[in-house]
Amino acid sequence: MLNREQLISIRRDLHQIPELGFKEFKTQAYLINHLDAYSKDRIEMETWRTGLFVKVKGTNPERVFAYRADMDGLSIPEDTGYPFQSVHEGKMHACGHDLHMTIALGVIDHFVHEPIKEDLLFMFQPAEEGPGGAEPMLTSDVLKKWTPDFITALHIAPEYPVGTIATKPGLLFANTSELVIDLEGKGGHAAYPHLANDMVVAASALVGQLQSVISRNVDPLDSAVITIGTITGGTAQNIIAQHAKLDGTIRTLSPESMEKVRKRIEALAKGIEIGYECKATVRYPSSYYEVDNSKELTEEFMSYVAEEGLANVVECREAMTGEDFGYMLKKYPGFMFWLGVDSEYGLHHAKLMPDEKAIETAVNVMTAYFKKQAGE
């Protein structure tokens, strides 16, 4: 079976080849090449776009236990100084998906050599960071023949020490939505503002107004966030901007709050149209459903891991993080948990450096849990 050093070597291989959503061609090829070493009597594989379904056969299966591992990297120039740094310029595994895949391979390896009664399905999912791979992957015909009875996933957590996992029954991660607002006015010479409709000014006004949406429309005991990450507009210092664009994100802890926030944003955009004599178009290119953990399965998992001393178990609060694993939990019961990796730098940071000892912790937790669920 794969030992700690071999698992770390796999993680470092994957770390060097981060790829964006639905472009994970090298990553998929690496996984297939690794898994091809196992006997076809023990595993079956089905590709799905740039993702992969892998079934580890049980000895006398009546159920299917599933585990999802996301695959894609981010458009972030790496600044870790690793000797195994990304070879893809401007791209990095800055959210731990290299560890997620490595952990899945470790669990697969264990059960290839020591099978349990039930079948295990591993879903290597592309495009978690965008545009979203979970929802379309669920439409695959593969899931008609390998239908999970429950599904699990994990995500690295830089803020927790190695040897700690954190989760909670119920809502774990927020509903999230991308937000794009296009403003179209009338450009002109900087010396003649009265003959133009300045979209930089309109965009500035709208950003300020958006700050009132949460504070005056969302229950103070609820939580929601609107963040405008980029504003673009204009072409030169002496030209009044005809166009401006706001790109951001909305995050809420309930679908109802998401609907309310969107309505208020659209109302403010209409006000900008009137006040600045322009055209405002509001779009939501993609959105992720909340991660809502099964109460029964999560409580059982937390109790088992704590009682067996497999990891330190923390019941955490919900987070405003977005995760398309929520779509999988809409279809199948299951849960997600945080895996402590003790990094000084956080997720999506160019210097994220997770402690690789966490890989072994996660493999041990998941193999023990699947054995327990199979009654072994």
Swiss-Prot record:
Pathway stated in the Swiss-Prot or TrEMBL entry: Amino-acid biosynthesis; L-lysine biosynthesis via DAP pathway; LL-2,6-diaminopimelate from (S)-tetrahydrodipicolinate (acetylase route): step 3/3
HAMAP family given in the database record: DapEL
Any one GO molecular-function label of the UniProt entry = N-acetyldiaminopimelate deacetylase activity
Q: What class of enzyme is it?
A: hydrolase
User: Member of which family?
Assistant: Belongs to the peptidase M20A family. N-acetyldiaminopimelate deacetylase subfamily.
From the Swiss-Prot or TrEMBL record, give the protein name: N-acetyldiaminopimelate deacetylase
For this protein, the record's Pfam families field holds: M20_dimer (PF07687), Peptidase_M20 (PF01546)
Question: Has keyword Amino-acid biosynthesis?
Answer: yes
| Keywords for this protein | Amino-acid biosynthesis, Diaminopimelate biosynthesis, Hydrolase, Lysine biosynthesis
GO process annotations (BP): diaminopimelate biosynthetic process; lysine biosynthetic process via diaminopimelate
Q: What does this protein do?
A: Catalyzes the conversion of N-acetyl-diaminopimelate to diaminopimelate and acetate.
